[in-house]
UniProtKB/Swiss-Prot annotation:
ATP binds at residues 387-394. The lineage of its organism: Eukaryota, Fungi, Dikarya, Ascomycota, Pezizomycotina. Component of the U5 snRNP complex. The gene is prp28. It is an enzyme of class 3 (hydrolase). This is Pre-mRNA-splicing ATP-dependent RNA helicase prp28.
Length: 783
């Protein structure tokens, strides 16, 4: 069958001219222009628009419009792709085309602005006409802004002028003064309102930047205490802060008073005026004025904090300066009414003759113990001096002793004075230390005419009795031999009023506590100080008092010098000293900071001898060198080994006679012997100059003995080295040794000692100290 016939396309309808809309009624207003129109509509014209061209095919009134064909999806997609491709391609515009587009855009903006202006102008004109019809010519609604600030232009009329009935005259005009004041008030109010708005609501983002404004650094931790200048809201508008007064810090009428230059200028002008007015007495008065100004200026420097204590005069020293001075020299004092230390020999208060001897001997600057102890001893105070070895303690007690004796009558004035014993006694633990003190004391006593005698073991009693036949102001002795002399009636202490105990802790360690108590009990009680506050009064203790028998004497003065403070030493101090002043240099029991301490863990005699030979052969240390051992029989064995290595050596121990001891020390001091092998006998108080090395072949049995062993080097401010051979038998002192090495700034703790089990905690159980030197001090003449 044939298919259905193809449908023919419908004929196109004939378009007719559009029918004009009916005219609006007369009473209706014209509709507003559409918002999207870019230009106002053209004015109406009488002519009709031209009719469109007729189409070819026209349909009748009864025919139907054909239905619109639907759009093809493929066609829409194709058009969309073409539009996207055209938009993606860059389109080149020439300069003329770009200028044309810019001009068209600018013309549209100008036209739009003009249209808005004309529209707003019409409304403003209407509001002005309505204002004239209102009573008093004021309309409250007309002054309220009706649009954003951007729509207001200079063409808009100004707001109505306010009228004040109270200030107007009969003609209805406002007073000129009132208007000016009102304007100023309004300006200030507006400015303050703007500042308040800026403070609480924030400044405008476009105008808040200032190059001079301080910015807070997020990485800077320093707090800023200053306000920014822009944060002062009253600086420009409040008359109180409009002009700030800058403070002046110098000159007349200023914050800090007179400057030195201004004060000097005023004083000189005043002095010149006095000279011009009075030719006769004006010059004298002018000099007095200038002298007063100079004194005032010197007095003003008393409170200056920028000067060091060494640059100030003694009368200008303040409490802060003395505190800094004590910290510089590591001086600590305890006790009531303790005087300040002396800064130099000139401020010591010593007599000029004694000061000349001090400079002649070669004492340049006083040591810390001398700075603190001499002023206290000069006030007749009892004293306990705790200082490290080699700190100058000998001169610290000798110089005040000589001043004390110089005020007493000469001992050879009468025969009975010779028989009553010495004025002062100095106790030392060993013979060598006593003889060393005697040598140092004779440097001062021989020029002053005083007699010094040493009483030590090793010499016959007859020889020492012969030395005492003419009397002596000062006796230097060991405790044991002095007790022998007292018991055999060779010596009495009837007029002894000055007692010095040097190395008191060493005397207790050697078992001399009982002899020391016997000596102190043999002193007369008539010149003993009272145990009251009067013992701290320097004026009362320096005066003579009646001692009975028709004689006047001074109070007894007792001084004790030590490196450590064991319990036995404290017990003696509490019994025989009255309200003592305690001076501590550094810390009690610490080694000298100038000594480098080295510790080596070496077990066995042979290994230690080999290590000692390597040290001596290295050439690192120059003689003299001291080697300490614990057992007397090891001294000779080690000395022989040292001689085989090519070094000269001598020994010093308790089995040696006094002549052998003196000869050994003399050979080391004069440089003829390189190495001194000794026991603890030489560990206390013996001063061998320029010792570069101390070797502890055997570790000391106590940390106190170790402290005094290594104190033989690094004396008088010089540096030295101490090497210690340590073994498992020294477990009792390992903890204390480790603590001492930790405190030393120039020493290092070896890993073997740090990790050793015995060095982790202090031993709690007591151990018996073996005194290998006991046989040397026992028996007749042993002391």
């Amino acid at each position: 069958m044939p298919g259905p016939p193809a449908t023919a396309p419908p004929p196109e309808p004939i378009e007719r001219p559009p029918t004009p809309p009916p005219p609006p009624p007369e009473d209706s207003a014209a509709p507003p222009p559409p918002p999207d129109m870019s230009a106002p509509p053209p004015p109406p014209q009488d002519e009709l628009p031209p009719a469109p061209e007729p189409k070819k095919k026209k349909l009748g009134w009864g025919s139907k419009r054909p239905a619109a064909a639907p759009l093809s999806v493929e066609e829409l997609v194709r058009k969309k792709r073409e539009a996207d491709a055209a938009a993606a391609k860059p389109k080149f515009l020439s300069k003329k085309e770009r200028e044309k587009i810019a001009l068209e855009k600018r013309a549209k903006e100008v036209e739009q602005s003009r249209r808005k202006t004309s529209t707003n102008g019409a409304s403003d004109t209407a509001s002005v006409r309505s204002e004239s019809a209102t009573p008093n010519g004021v309309d409250r609604t007309a002054s309220i802004p009706t649009g954003p600030r951007a729509m207001r232009t200079s063409e808009a009329p100004p707001p109505p002028r306010p009228r004040h009935d109270s200030s107007s005259n009969g003609n209805g005009n406002s007073n000129s003064n009132s208007n000016s004041n009102g304007t100023v008030d309004e300006d200030e109010a507006a400015a303050q309102a703007a500042l308040v708005k800026q403070r609480y609501m924030g400044a405008e983002m476009t105008s808040s930047f200032s190059a001079k404004k301080k910015r807070k650094r997020t990485t800077d931790r320093k707090f800023n205490f200053e306000w920014n200048a822009e944060e002062d809201t009253s600086r420009d508008y409040n008359p109180l802060y409009a002009q700030r007064h800058e403070a002046n810090f110098f000159g007349r009428g200023r914050l800090a008073g007179f400057g030195d230059d201004v004060a000097d200028g005023v004083a000189r002008k005043y002095a010149a005026a006095l000279e011009d007015r009075d030719r006769e007495a004006g010059s004298v008065r002018a000099r007095e004025i200038l002298e007063m100004e100079r004194r005032r200026r010197e007095e003003s420097t008393r409170n200056q904090l920028d000067k060091h204590w060494s640059e100030k005069k003694l009368e200008h020293m303040r409490e802060r300066d003395w505190r800094i001075f004590k910290e510089d020299f590591n001086i600590a004092t305890k006790g009531g009414s303790v005087p300040n230390p002396m800064r130099s020999w000139a401020e010591s208060g010593l007599p000029s003759r004694l000061l000349d001897l001090v400079h002649r001997v070669g004492y340049k600057d006083p040591t810390p113990i001398q700075r603190a102890a001499i002023p206290i001893a000069m006030q007749s105070r009892d004293l306990i001096g705790v200082a490290v070895t080699g700190s100058g303690k000998t001169a610290a007690f000798l110089l005040p002793l000589l001043v004390y004796i110089a005020e007493l009558p000469r001992i050879d004035e009468f025969e009975w004075r010779k028989n009553d014993g010495p004025y002062a006694i100095v106790l030392a633990p060993t013979r060598e230390l006593a003889q060393q003190i005697e040598i140092e004391a004779k440097k001062f006593t021989i020029p002053l005419g005083f007699t010094v005698v040493s009483i030590v073991g090793g010499h016959s009693l007859e020889e020492q009795a012969y030395s005492l036949r003419n009397g002596a102001e000062i006796i230097i002795a060991t405790p044991g031999r002095l007790v022998d002399c007292i018991e055999r009636r060779l010596l009495v202490l009837s007029q002894c009023c000055y007692v010095i105990m040097d190395e008191a802790d060493r005397m207790i360690d050697l078992g001399f506590e009982e002899p020391v108590n016997k000596i102190l009990d043999a002193l007369p009680v008539s010149n003993e100080k009272p145990d009251s506050d009067a013992a701290e009064n320097a004026a009362a203790m320096s005066q003579l008092h009646h001692a009975g028998g028709g004689r006047d004497t001074r109070y007894r003065q007792t001084m004790m010098y030590t490196a450590t403070m064991p319990t036995a030493v404290e017990r003696i101090a509490r019994k025989y000293l009255r309200r003592p002043a305690i001076v501590t240099i550094g810390s009690a029991g610490e080694a000298v900071d100038t000594v480098e301490q080295r510790v080596e863990l070496i077990a066995g005699e042979d290994k230690r001898k080999k290590r000692l030979g390597d040290i001596l052969s290295s050439g690192e240390f120059r003689p003299p060198i001291i080697v300490f051992v614990n057992i007397k029989r090891n001294c000779d064995a080690i000395a022989r080994e040292i001689k085989q290595w090519g070094f000269s050596s001598v020994t010093l121990h308790g089995s040696k006679t006094q002549e052998q001891r003196e000869a050994a020390l003399a050979s080391v001091r004069n440089g003829s012997t390189d190495v001194l092998v000794a026991t603890d006998l030489a560990g206390r108080g013996i001063d061998v100059p320029d010792v570069s090395l101390v070797v502890n072949f055997n570790m000391a049995t106590s940390i106190e003995s170790y402290t005094h062993r290594i104190g033989r080097t690094g004396r008088a401010g010089k540096s030295g080295v101490a090497i210690t051979f340590l073994g498992n038998e020294d477990a009792d002192v390992m903890y204390d040794l480790k603590q001492m090495l930790i405190k030393s700034p120039i020493s290092r703790v070896p890993d073997e000692l740090r990790k050793h089990e015995a060095a982790q905690q202090k031993p709690t159980r007591g151990f018996s100290k073996k005194n290998d030197e006991s046989s040397a001090f026992g028996g007749k003449g042993g002391w």
